[in-house]
Amino acid sequence: MVLPFTLQQLRIFKAIASEKSFTQAAEILFVSQPSLSKQIKTLENRLGILLLNRTGNKILLTEAGVVFLQYSERILALCEESCRALNDLKDGERGNLKVGASQTIGAYLMPRVLTLFAQSYPQINLHIDIDSTRIIAKKVADRSLDIAVVGGDIPTGLKKNLEIEDFVEDELILIISKSHPFAKKKKKKISKEDLYHLNFITLNSNSTIHKFINNILIQNNIQTAQFNVIMELNSIEAIKTAVSLGLGAAFVSSSAIEKELELKTVEIITIENIRITRTLSIITNPDSHRSKAFDFFYNELWLLKNL
């Protein structure tokens, strides 16, 4: 059977779907726009169906385009995986590994893991992708990533395609500035009622951590809707700076404030009878080829957990 498409046409189609632009896709793939347009036209003619709707400057996938994109991504991922599997046989302890992490983990936990791993296996090239838990999980499911560590809820629709393992516990703690009156409280502990007297600096209300903290507090009969939220920021670094300047209080991951605690720019306070923790997970695709590089990294993660 002669296939009605080539791998290059799949790469072109995937790039256009991702960039929503012929011009940008051509730049990424280092081909001319006329050549790219010709390849797509040939692809659609051979398939006998329209994949893209071109309306002015907008490019949208047709229903057929959405279906074809899913298969294109899987085919390309399998091609890359087959090359990695063969290279793994040739190269022994050399190789490449694509690692994903959700945002807080990628910014604060993963750099330490990667540094230690690079010291043990300098010959393995790591490619790191940091994004939301949902996007990272999708990339592991479609084999764009080999392994990932995430902290948020994994979409139900993806779970059947993933192997999910509990990794470590991450505590979400309340921080204030050293000059805050609550910092002088005995044992640095406050009551639930004290929370309503704080000015809060939070992550965007759509963020996974924000929703998780909110749910835990509500389960403990705390009315978060009555909190005085003075600022919403999309950066944990910005939140920590704002807290250290005395602008308010914030919940952050314990892994994110090691530097601030060492410099003594913030203070941790606990809430009576409440401890907020979440479980970080290692996610993999059970159907993917597991290279030696994968095994080394996977084993290193568990060794680091037990240190």
Swiss-Prot record:
Location in or out of the cell = Plastid, Chloroplast
A GO term for molecular function:
transcription cis-regulatory region binding
User: Pfam families, alphabetically?
Assistant: HTH_1 (PF00126), LysR_substrate (PF03466)
Entry keyword annotation includes Flavoprotein: no
What superkingdom heads the lineage? Eukaryota
Assign the protein's first listed, main location to one coarse class: plastid
Keywords recorded for this protein, A-Z: Chloroplast, DNA-binding, Plastid, Transcription, Transcription regulation
- Tell me which SUPFAM superfamilies the record gives: Periplasmic binding protein-like II, Winged helix' DNA-binding domain
Listed GO CC annotations: chloroplast
Q: Does the keyword Repeat apply?
A: no
**Residue span, HTH lysR-type domain:** 5-62
Q: Output one GO BP term.
A: regulation of DNA-templated transcription
Gene3D superfamilies associated with the record: 3.40.190.290, Winged helix-like DNA-binding domain superfamily/Winged helix DNA-binding domain
InterPro entries cross-referenced by the UniProt entry: LysR_subst-bd, Tscrpt_reg_HTH_LysR, WH-like_DNA-bd_sf, WH_DNA-bd_sf
As annotated, the DNA-binding region falls at 22-41
Per the entry, what this protein does is: Trans-acting transcriptional regulator of RuBisCO genes (rbcL and rbcS) expression.
Q: Which family does it belong to?
A: Belongs to the LysR transcriptional regulatory family.
Output this protein's name: Probable RuBisCO transcriptional regulator
Taxonomic source organism: Thalassiosira pseudonana (Marine diatom)
